Amino acid sequence: MADTGAPGGETLLFLTDEQLRKGIEAMFFAYRGFTADPDRILDQHDYGRAHHRAIHFINREPGLTVTTLISVLGVTKQSLNRVLRTLIDDGLVESRVGRRDKRERHLHLTEKGAVLERELSEAQRVRMRAAYRAAGPQAVAGFRQVLEAMMDPAMRRHYQMLKDAE
């Protein structure tokens, strides 16, 4: 058995159900912490997490098509349209007709949208930076490996495309 060097002599290869349960619970609580600061900001604008995810990925890939955003977010066209309608009406997102295909809609953040995106992202970067510094580089690399291994194959492809675009 490979020892992780973790307190309690936990091993990498043979985790018990109890150890896995603790990991699941840690993910739940970490997610609550990760989303708490942006949630407070979103509440001030009467937005929710769906708005945040849309803003994040539109910022990440300006000109992203609605179809691609639906795929990345794993939502229905109907649910995304409600979110996009709000963001467009509020002046945070612009929808532009495709140059090659007039049926396509390409999404871009406006300056107002970019300001909100920076505020939301900075709130999460502060929390992640502190956690990463506390954990150290090996833990950060291991954490990323675990997250990538947990992704569904389609989501992993989207994630890989974003990484490759850097």
Swiss-Prot record:
Fetch the Gene3D superfamilies from UniProt.
Winged helix-like DNA-binding domain superfamily/Winged helix DNA-binding domain (1.10.10.10)
Task: Tell me the DNA-binding residue spans.
Answer: 66-89
Question: GO biological process: any one?
Answer: response to stress
**Main function:** Necessary for photosynthetic and respiratory growth.
**Protein name per UniProt:** HTH-type transcriptional regulator PetP
Disulfide links within the chain: none
Superkingdom as given in the UniProt entry:
Bacteria
Q: Which residues form the HTH marR-type domain?
A: 17-152
Supply the InterPro entries for this chain.
Answer: HTH_MarR-typ, MarR/SlyA-like, Tscrpt_reg_MarR-type_CS, WH-like_DNA-bd_sf, WH_DNA-bd_sf
Which GO MF terms are attached to this record?
DNA binding; DNA-binding transcription factor activity
Please tell me the species this chain comes from: Rhodobacter capsulatus (strain ATCC BAA-309 / NBRC 16581 / SB1003)
Keywords attached to this Swiss-Prot or TrEMBL record, sorted alphabetically, are: DNA-binding, Transcription, Transcription regulation
- Pfam families the record matches: MarR_2
